Amino acid sequence: MSELDPTESLIEYPSDFPIKVMGLAHDQFVPTIIDVVVVHDPEFHEGRIEQRPSSAGNYLSLTVTVRATSREQLDNLYRALSSHPMVKYVL
């Protein structure tokens, strides 16, 4: 049985790739996330976001679908989102 190279990606590039981003429900949350994503996917637009509020309305879950072109691009995007103060979780 062959072993997988940990540096090798299982994703075929380019491809559409969904990322879940969760944070407090705030009127600037969506525009802020768009600004972060556009740095890593310049063709990203608002139409590629699905929004779901929490049952109490305190949190907002976004699914942003980016055009992934490399593992490095996705890693950088995950780091940027995870380190943003408005973001609680990135999946």
From Swiss-Prot:
Family: Belongs to the UPF0250 family.
NCBIfam families assigned: PRK02047.1
UniProt xrefs under SUPFAM superfamilies: YbeD/HP0495-like
Disulphide connectivity of cysteines: none
Protein name: UPF0250 protein mma_3250
Organism name: Janthinobacterium sp. (strain Marseille) (Minibacterium massiliensis)
